[in-house]
Amino acid sequence: MSQFRTRALASVAAAASLSLLLAACGGGEDSDSAAKPTEATKGKVTLEFWSWTDGIEAQTKVWNKEHPETQIKFVNAAGDTAYQKLRAAVNAGTAPCLSKMDGMNLANFAADGLLTDITDVAGQYKGKYTAAAWNAVSPGGTTFGIPMGSSPLFTAYRADLFEKYGIEAPKTWDDLIAAGKKAQKKNKKVKIFNMAGEDPSTLVDLSWESGAQWYKAEDDHWVVDFTSPEALKAGDIVQQLVDNDLASNASYADPGVFKTWDLGTTIAMTTSTWQLPIYNTNFPKSKGKWQLADSPMFDTAKPQTSSNFDTLGVLKGCKYPDRAAEFAAWLSSSKESLTTLTDPASKSGLFPAVTDVSPYVDKIIPTEMFNGESDSAKVITDAASWVGDQWQYGPNYAAMYSEMQKQWGKVMKKEITVKEMLTSIEKWTVDDLNDKGIKAVAGS
């Protein structure tokens, strides 16, 4: 089980490049210019805020009690059509000032001219967050929101079955392949990993960790590169898992998916913080038999992980972007807010994107699930500090990912190879961007 992530170029030149890129897709003229405080921001204001994360509304009430000059009107926007509703609201001129969104959608909204450039007013908060997290809200160096949460990648494995099969927690992806083969010599039915037929996020994780850059903003165009040496190195690991039948293909849409791990059919997974409470509830037979370890690496001397990021985007038309940024920074970085939101009792599933996560780690670890023989807190803290900052979402990432999902299923069925899929996706992505009037070239 895994996730997604992003990276942006932080230089002034890159910021200018993004402006050209946004203009190429219709976002440049419509996007609000860099936000600056106005006379209206000096008095009492009310901002509308959309989110669908448990526990957030309660924190909004705490803020409102302490900040009478900036009142937040919370709207629970839960539902499968939240992003469509946001787009419609922006186009109708009725959008909230602030909304939850993942990094992928923040980049897409920015490219479509649906967000406000808050670079000037948000810079004061940058130091509170990791570089990778800030990149997630600053595609091309232009800031459109504030980081909210992260989900750094690490490994969970069945320590009892690893011992039974004579294998150790893999330090590298090659180690994972070798461990899977060794385990199958003792049990032909066991799988070292799971890759759902509908979910190519494993490839995203591997590509991020390998140093690949599927998208890169460069001058006035996008460079699209799914077939770089780094990308193909990541793809090769997936191909080996498929060719050697080392991975199960349990669907994450199936409520019974947890049984593949709980019953020991699959004995390891890459995972993250928000998923831990879910396992604690759904692994009744294997409680106390699990252990955490670092995610397998491509280069242990230069550890690099991946992480999806939740963000708080400032929508086009927001009249008080400085107040929106102030509230967002308080919600996502203050000790007062994070102490509550990172408590499992809040049910938020939030893990911070701040530079120092150590105060919030211990309480998210379900003690009944793990055998206590590894330093779970250190594993999580290290994973958070190792997230690579080269990853960048492109303007059509969401559409690209949907296309990849279609081809990923064919890879899992051995109908096409990973390399064939990556080659096809690269061409599809370049063509799609150019068809939309966004200049793009293939990188390889």
Describe each region flagged by the PLM:
Residues S2-N108, G123-Y125, A250, D299, ...:
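Conserved N-terminal structural module of periplasmic/extracytoplasmic solute-binding proteins
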Residues Q59, E230-I237, K319-L331, M421:
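Short amphipathic alpha-helical coupling segments at ligand-binding clamshell hinges
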Residues A88-A89, P96-C97, K126-L161, K191, ...:
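A structural signal for short loop-to-beta-strand junctions that line the ligand-binding cleft
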Residues G103-L153, D205-S207, Q291-A293, A377-V379, ...:
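Hinge/lid segment of periplasmic solute-binding proteins
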Residues T142-M148, L153, I177-V224, E230, ...:
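Extracytoplasmic/periplasmic solute-binding protein
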Residues E163, T381-S444:
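Conserved C-terminal helix/tail region of periplasmic/extracytoplasmic solute-binding proteins
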Residues H221-A250, S295:
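Glycine-centered hinge/linker elements that transmit conformational signals in sensory
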Residues W274-S286, D299-E403, A440-S444:
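C-terminal lobe and pocket-closing loops
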